[in-house]
Amino acid sequence: MPLDMEMIADQISRAFRGESWHGPSVREVLAGVSAEDAAAHPIAGAHSIWEIVLHLTGGYNLVLRRVHGERAQLSPEEEWPPVAECSAEAWRENQHTLEQLNQQLQSAVRAFPAERLSQELGSEYSAYIQFCGTPQHDLYHAGQIVLLKKALSASRVHRAEAPGRDDRSS
């Protein structure tokens, strides 16, 4: 069965928006996350939710640049950019940018000639590997976000149960 470009774009959409068998999508795991929680580092040495969103944004940008003919690589700063401004507005904007780039990537995949899937695309990796790798990458990081949210929740419970804490003064 030949692989249809619409099928690949659909997998990119499902990993980001939902309606898949695997569990929650990127958008689903980000729902309800505040800017404060997104910027938090509840696990020592791990990236924050916000940093992961910026990392995913960089990944989408990279593949889009390659689709448009660049032989692009990400610098370490582009791969894991720092959070520039920690505000609710900046958090909303970064999520919006991620969503827009996901939609652009889906459109680019739909328009991509299927006969070129096995050819290198701006790197040593084929278009097929990069297009199919995008939802894999999204879901890997969606799982990390789920764990970060659990760690945030556990740290709140731990703080609330800390001896000597008097919540009556709040």
Question: Model-flagged regions — what are they?
Answer:
Residues 2-23, 27-30, 35-81, 120-170:
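Short, contiguous alpha-helical
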Residues 83-119, 129-137:
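Acidic/histidine-rich alpha-helical segments that form the ligand environment
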